[in-house]
């Protein structure tokens, strides 16, 4: 999914890296070394990022949610998403005796990454999702047993907005 939703970034990186790689064959001396270094400066961080992402998202147990186990089942679960909800359906199925309240703070004017727009087309939001503002959550104080914000809070880029969000939680 990372490549699928961020393909533009990887395409530009591949083109840039390939450009410097192939140009380096027509050069000599310091210019050849510089082109090779530029190629590596693009390829190594992007390749490392992809390998780390593969390990975290695909090879690890992160998406099997074995780490999300409760000795006492929560009565009310709030699941927070930011335009891309991969977990509400799993939570609803796994904790069917709990009441799930999925909320989504995605705001197209604030959260402008094209990858989220692409993800929303592939993964529709949970049908019970409540659209909210990250600064004004419609939850009563102490009304939930568990809040899950799995891979969503990092989408709040503004520091003040992030602080306000955590205060709301």
Q: What spans do the regions from the language model cover?
A:
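Membrane-proximal soluble helical/coiled-coil segments
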Residues: 63-169
